[in-house]
């Protein structure tokens, strides 16, 4: 059960209750108000981090570091991904999955008997794609104006993902970090840091290779 506490505080409490060791934990700052029944500890923490992402537009990754829990924002790893350091790659771009250019949040003000609407939109992409609306009801209007802006920042991007196959390995690369990508795909030049969503390391006959799943929205420099 989690109520009115930041993800950082939640992780510390779970660690204390289950006798887990904590390393350095980033301060997520945003107090999450929710109750999770019949959920795993991982799901409880992930739900809290997801709410923090939607409210503040910040990604946090929780992982084990030498027996201690570590929570941090995306960090840069000194690893360059190019057409010469990888065997092959697959590229996908879509606006069909979790892409929105208009955010609408509704709060039912029972005292006044009205529904308050909070909106944010990107007119440029509405003209380009038509209206792709995200709608949700919220329990509190506190921070609603900031939340719609954060959600627009998260979702108003074409979903661009790249799968890199058999690139030179680096044990410092793990999910949640950022690697520098320099590729030309379908005439579009990518030269930016991208988020590692998933990594698989392979060690064979003294050779270290890895497969990566990367994402980066419109390959902006916000990281």
Indicate where each model-derived feature is located.
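Acidic, small/polar-enriched beta strand-loop surface segments
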Residues: 57-156, 160-204, 218-220
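N-terminal targeting/assembly segments of extracytoplasmic apparatus and virion spike/baseplate proteins
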Residues: 1-24, 179-190, 200-222
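Charged- and aromatic-enriched interaction segments used to assemble
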Residues: 1-94
């Amino acid at each position: 059960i989690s109520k009115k506490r930041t993800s950082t505080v939640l992780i510390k409490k779970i660690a204390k209750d289950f006798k887990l060791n904590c390393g350095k934990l980033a301060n997520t700052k945003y107090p999450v108000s929710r109750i999770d029944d019949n959920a795993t500890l991982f799901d409880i923490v992930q739900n809290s981090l997801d709410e923090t992402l939607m409210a503040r537009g910040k990604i946090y990754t929780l992982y084990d570091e030498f027996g201690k829990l570590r929570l941090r924002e995306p960090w840069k790893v000194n690893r360059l991904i190019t057409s010469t350091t990888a065997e092959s790659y697959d590229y996908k771009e879509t606006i069909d999955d979790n892409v929105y250019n208009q955010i609408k949040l509704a709060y039912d003000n029972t005292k006044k008997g009205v529904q308050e609407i909070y909106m944010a939109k990107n007119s440029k992409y509405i003209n380009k794609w038509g209206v792709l609306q995200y709608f949700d009801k919220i329990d509190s209007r506190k921070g609603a104006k900031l939340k719609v802006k954060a959600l627009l920042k998260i979702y108003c991007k074409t979903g661009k993902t790249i799968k890199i196959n058999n690139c030179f390995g680096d044990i410092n690369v793990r999910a949640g970090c950022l690697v520098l990508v320099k590729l030309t795909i379908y005439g579009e030049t990518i030269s930016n840091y991208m988020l590692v969503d998933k990594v698989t390391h392979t060690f064979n006959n003294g050779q270290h290779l890895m497969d990566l799943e990367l994402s980066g929205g419109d390959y902006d420099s916000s990281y």
